[in-house]
């Protein structure tokens, strides 16, 4: 979906799919494709009618190895470094009409928005796990590390930090689970709650992991412990599947 000039503004994408008989010819460049180098099948959004704006966007299934489709450079990301994130290029890439999602043109943008509604609680769950892991490490470390003749956790200022971290995590957990239950129940109008869960859980993850680094002191800034990785991994959850500013 994303391109160099169209991230949050997904409706402004420039990749085109021009009909040629019973085929479509794709031309364009895609950015920020998670698992871009390892996937075998891709959903590609392109303009089939540029004059209609977002209503002219259609979705296509494109398989790896299709002539004209190549995987580009891998991004050097700050976090989630085990996940390959790649650029994708389409140059006169021919796909048959049978690979038009939904069987008709113009439904791509709606398809993308419905997909994101269900993906955002997943990102929220990812963030929740990062926050929970950071809290557990922080509790363990502050209960063992001694300063000024007592454990770090014995200081009331540290207890307040840990209490806030735990409170925010539990609030995020309820939003994540509630949105997941609605999806499992077949609810269709989930856009608002999905956005709320995504915003709150990912902001919580960023705060909690940052505070955990602080509680570890110098060790939090090193790779002796996984805390610095949690903080780096948490950052992307505020960005992908719709930035938190757009969700608000």
Named regions from a protein language model:
Residues 1-19:
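A gly/ser-rich beta-alpha-beta helix-loop segment of oxidoreductase catalytic cores
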Residues 6-8, 31-37, 80, 117-122, ...:
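Glycine-rich phosphate/pyrophosphate-binding beta-alpha loops
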Residues 8, 99-105:
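Cytochrome P450 core scaffold surrounding the K-helix E-X-X-R motif
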Residues 12-14, 65-94:
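Flexible, small-/acidic-enriched active-site or ligand-binding loops
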Residues 12-16, 23, 41-45, 59-61, ...:
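Conserved hydrophobic/aromatic beta-strand scaffold that supports enzyme active sites
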Residues 19-24, 87-93, 103-107, 114-248:
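Alpha-helical interface subdomain recognition
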Residues 20-22, 47-51, 64-67, 91-98:
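Short loop segments at secondary-structure junctions
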Residues 27-71:
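A short core secondary-structure module
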């Amino acid at each position: 979906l994303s391109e160099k000039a169209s991230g949050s503004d997904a409706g402004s994408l420039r990749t085109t799919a021009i009909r040629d008989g019973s085929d479509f010819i794709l031309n364009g460049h895609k950015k920020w494709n998670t698992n871009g180098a390892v996937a075998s099948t891709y959903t590609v959004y392109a303009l089939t009618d540029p004059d209609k704006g977002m209503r002219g966007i259609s979705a296509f299934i494109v398989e790896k190895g299709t002539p004209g489709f190549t995987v580009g450079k891998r991004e050097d990301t700050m976090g989630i470094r085990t996940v390959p994130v790649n650029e994708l290029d389409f140059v006169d890439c021919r796909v048959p009409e049978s690979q038009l999602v939904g069987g008709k043109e113009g439904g791509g943008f709606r398809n993308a928005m419905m997909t994101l509604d269900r993906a955002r609680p997943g990102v929220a769950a990812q963030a929740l796990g990062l926050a929970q892991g950071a809290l557990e490490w922080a509790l363990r470390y502050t209960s063992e590390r001694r300063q000024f003749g007592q454990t770090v956790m014995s200081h009331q200022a540290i207890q307040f930090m840990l209490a806030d971290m735990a409170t925010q995590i539990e609030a995020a957990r309820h939003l994540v689970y509630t949105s997941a239950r609605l999806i499992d129940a077949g609810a269709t109008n989930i856009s608002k709650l999905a956005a709320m869960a995504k915003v709150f859980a990912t902001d919580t993850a960023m705060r909690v992991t940052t505070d955990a680094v602080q509680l570890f002191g110098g060790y939090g800034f090193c790779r002796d412990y996984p805390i610095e990785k949690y903080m780096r991994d948490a950052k992307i959850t505020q960005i992908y599947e719709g930035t938190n500013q757009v969700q608000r």
